Amino acid sequence: MNVTLESLATCFQGLVPAMLFTCSQDGVPNAAYLSHVDYVDARHVALSYQFFNKSRRNIAENPHALVMVPDPDTGQGWQLRLLFVRSETEGPLFERMALRIEAIASYCGLKGIFKLRAADVYEVLSIEPSAEEPATSVGTRFHPTRGSGLPHAVFTMKALQDLADRIQRTDSLESLVDAILAGLEESFGFRNSMILVPAEEAGVLVTIATRGYPQNGSGAEARIGEGIVGLVAEARKPIRISGLMRGMLYAYAMHHGSQDAQPAALRRRIPLPGLPNPESQLGVPLMVRGELVGVLCIESDSPYRFHEEDKSSIDLLGHYLAIAIQNMQLHEERTTESVESLAIPSHAAISAVSSPDTRAIPTRQVVYHCADECIMVDNEYLIRSLPARILWRLLKTHEQTGRNEFTNRELRLDKSLKLPDFKDNLEARLLLLRRRLEYKCPDIKIVTRARGRFALELGCELALSTEP
């Protein structure tokens, strides 16, 4: 049987544990579980050097080893006879393997605890089918994913074209991000996804669109370098993990820290939406000419949702979506400036919002906390940073003048908002603010009137106040 490493690409996803067998110089064998075997090239694989000190000592004495890997599509096990070649502590291979380990640890809140010491590269001397089903030998009940009726996202040209056609029909950032996530579900079968963009605060990403989650994630933040999303942004490389829950078992077992009450500054954050027990995660950096436009995150409760053959298509998809988002942001900024230059609303031309029935209108207590630059509505956190400053400016202007219509241009000209001079992403901030209000405080609405023009609509009375 002529079997190549390329034909076993699906075995190197880490879905089912592999087994590593080594032997000391005096003939004492040792067996250890491996979470992941990494494909290097047509003749080599790499094993992570982390915890298996006995295996490492044996290899130093006797460079021959045997590893058993399962095929997650068929359940067939394969024996790879190996010869140790070298250890790498830097370079693309080491970085790729270290990033996967760090992503799983960071997902558990244990970033920095699990470190890859080296990527040990082995030459594959022979490949033989295993007589024993490897999934049974490691105590894992195996369910093949192909041919079982489970959906598999195949990145065909037709699916990519369908998504591109959907994107071409959008005319705003809001419709674009919604079309992207809807297309990922309808064309590729990805039901749970979100898009994050860089926030005003350095080192932070903020969620502007989600799909498939019961909780509204608009405004949810991820710090760069933390969690899978943050690591994707930091490394600017895709992270694709299969069998995530199994990979997290060890990390959870090591986590004995107490869950102390969080300080107020941390409570004033919106948690990222997510599946309670994700089995697969995919994070894709959205890059344009070296600039991070955002991060696309996709989750699944299927252990083997993202396949090896999809890797190139995933990279291509990320580049296309990044260009689409950046072009839409530039398009909205330029067109709103040209439209707004024709007419800027005057105070006299715009009346305050009135309600046809004021008998049952509630009063909302809206408090702006200056130190944290955040807004609380009826003692519940709403939003912070630039979107909070924008909303506070709109509410105070309405309170003082009765105005309820505004333009993007006047916000850009308002120095008190402290918008960046270059690429302020104002449209993304307004989208975030609008969706956050829809979820947490529907009595306050920001309604688009025309490109670059919007209205503040109130279904409540406001009691505005500030806190240091």
Which role fits each region the language model picked out?
Residues 27, 136-174, 207, 293:
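Signal-transmission linkers at sensory-effector interfaces
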Residues 170-208, 216-217, 328:
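Helix-loop-beta substructure at the N-terminus of cytosolic sensory domains
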Residues 208, 215-274:
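Regulatory sensory and allosteric helical modules in signal-transduction proteins
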Residues 216, 276-279, 293, 299-316:
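Regulatory loop-to-helix N-cap segments in sensory/regulatory domains
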Residues 270, 279-287:
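A short, aliphatic-rich beta-strand micro-motif
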Residues 336-388, 392, 444-447, 451-455, ...:
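Short boundary/linker motifs that mark transitions into or out of structured domains
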Residues 380-414, 433:
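Short amphipathic alpha-helical recognition elements used for nucleic-acid or partner binding
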Residues 383-391, 419-440:
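DNA-recognition element of transcription regulators
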